[in-house]
């Protein structure tokens, strides 16, 4: 099956909630602002050189919402490795403080309609459903091309990662491990 590549860190919604609560660290604020200013066109230019079976930008519906749509539209299941997710600084701390935006709960409800299963820690599950502002691209690419794509993306200093894989459709559209 295909590998899933994510081109930007997750946690923008959680950090923005921490900003509103005046609890954010300077390093988290700077990291999220830098990411929001980084256009997806640079990652897109690299991805276009390869075989891309599906691609979407991760915005208000979060990785979980957009991933659910991608999986349902292709009659597949996405397996997300929560330990592989690129994450902004201090997100675990803010999530454990309950600084989760309301959109994350709505995104989780949306994904529950088509079905998801999670064995991940709660804060990582919250992160999967965290709405992103100017989030990265989620691309489904052939496994044999994933390392080369990742190498090119990292040459541009894009904080990307292989975060999971696409498998034949199971009962649920999204499995978060």
Predicted ranges, named:
Residues 2-177:
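Helix-biased detector of long, well-ordered alpha-helical tracts
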């Amino acid at each position: 099956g295909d590998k899933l590549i994510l081109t930007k860190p997750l946690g923008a919604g959680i950090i923005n909630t921490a900003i509103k609560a005046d609890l954010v660290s300077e390093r988290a604020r700077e990291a999220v602002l830098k990411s929001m200013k980084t256009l997806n066109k640079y990652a897109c230019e690299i991805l276009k050189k390869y075989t891309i079976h599906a691609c979407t930008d991760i915005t208000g519906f979060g990785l979980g919402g957009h991933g659910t749509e991608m999986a349902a539209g292709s009659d597949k299941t996405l397996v997300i490795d929560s330990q592989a997710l690129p994450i902004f600084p201090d997100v675990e701390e803010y999530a454990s403080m309950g600084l989760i935006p309301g959109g994350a709960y709505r995104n989780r409800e949306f994904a529950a309609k088509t079905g998801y299963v999670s064995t991940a820690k709660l804060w990582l599950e919250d992160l999967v459903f965290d709405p992103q502002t100017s989030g990265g691209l989620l691309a489904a690419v052939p496994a044999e091309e994933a390392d080369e794509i990742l190498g090119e993306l990292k040459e541009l200093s894009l904080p990307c990662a292989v975060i999971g894989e696409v498998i034949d459709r199971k009962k649920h559209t999204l499995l978060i491990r």
